[in-house]
Amino acid sequence: MSIELSRRDFIGTCSAAACSVSLGMAEASGLYPGGGYTGTLCLFSKPLPGMGWRQLAQAAKSVGFGGIDLTVRRGGHVQPERATEDLPKAVEAIREEGLDVPMITTEVTSADDPAARPILSTAAKLSIPFFKPGYYQYKMINVRRELESAASQFRGLVALSKQYGMQAGYHNHEEYIGAPVWDIASVMDMLDSKWAGFYFDARHAVAEGGVGGWKIAVNLVMPRLKMVAAKDFLWQKTETGWAARNCPLGEGMVDWKYFVNALAAGGFQGPISLHLEYDVVGEAGAAREENIVAALQRDLQFLKTRLREGYGAIAGER
C-alpha cells in the first residue's frame, strides 16, 4: 500500500489541519484563564491629523479609548525628524490626560534609516513597548529575491530595536510583503519572538485570504502576536470590477465573533488599535472631526461588545 502524497494533497491536508485547529480556538469562547481582556484599546491617530496631542487624547478618552497608537511618520502627529524633541512632549500630553501610548506607527524599514535610531531610542526611554515598522514591496520580478531583500532589512531593524528594548510588530497589509502572512512568517521564524512578531490585521487578512486562508493566518500568527489592528471592509462592484471598500466595524466581511474568540483562546492581551479608514460624511474642520469621533465611538462600542463576548469581560469596566 502506497503512502505517498502528491504536493497538492499534502498542502491540502496541512491546510485542513490548520483550519481545524484555528476553528477550535475560535469556537472555544471564554476559555482564556485570565477571565477578561486586559490590554489597551487604542485610537490610531491617523484619522484626526488636525488635532494636537492633548486634544487628541481628550477626544479619545471621551469616547472610551484607553490609549493612543501614535503616528510617528511623515504627515503624522510626530514628524520623524523631530522625534527626539516632539515624541516626549506628545507622550507627556497624552499621559497627562490619563491615556497610555503602548505603540507607535512608523515608516522605518531599515536600521540604516536616519530616523530609526532617534525614534526607537526615544520611544524606549518613554517606556513604549511596541512599534509598527514600514512596509516592503514586491516588484513582481523575482518575489523570492524581493522577499529575501526585505528580510535582510527587517532582520537588521529588529537587531537595532532589540538594542533599545523595543518590540517590532509587522503589519500584514494587502499588496505588500506580508499580505498573505506566510511569506513574512518564514522571516519571523528565524528571529527571537521576544523582539519580532505580528501586528495582525483581520481586514487585510480576509481580503487576501477569502474563506479559509485568513483563519489559517490567525492560527499562524498567534504564538507571536504583538498587536492587533481593528478595521473592516466589503467587496463592492464598480465599473472596472470588484474593489475592496473600507466600512464600519461589523458591516463588512470580517467574522468578528470568530476572530475575537480566537484571540481570547490564544491568550492575546496586547494593544488593539482601532482604525478608521472609511469616508465619514459631513462638514469640514471641527464639525468633520466631531463626525469622525462619533464614528470612532460607534466602532469602539462594537469592538467592546465583541471583546466582552469573546473574553468574558474587559478589565476596568463595571
Protein language model features and the residues they cover:
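N-terminal twin-arginine translocation
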Residues: I3-D9, C19-P33
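Conserved, mostly hydrophobic/aromatic
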Residues: A60, I68, I94, A123, ...
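Active-site beta-loop-alpha junctions enriched in small/polar residues
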Residues: F44-L48, T71-G75, T106-T109, Y136-Y138, ...
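Acidic/histidine-rich catalytic cores of soluble enzymes
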Residues: S161-M253, V260
